[in-house]
């Protein structure tokens, strides 16, 4: 199991946050990474869901900010996501269909 250790000693399990985030509107898949001591969500948008709800690419940043706010309401203070970074394509996967995390850690 993957774990992120914060500077104040908190253990964060990104898969638990990703499971919540992947159930949010317009999120196809996600990956939680640490960047400069803060948690960032890498998100591949669900473009089909966006189309069916009439959400354009121009509206996407605002929609993702709403997703981030709703997600943070479900998380402990030390698990808060500071920003969402959009990825246009699905993440690279292993043959077992799990995301190759090491490719996105930097």
Positions of PLM-derived features:
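Conserved C-terminal "lid"/linker of ANL adenylate-forming enzymes
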Residues: 29, 37, 66-106
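AMP-binding/adenylate-forming catalytic core of the ANL superfamily
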Residues: 1-78
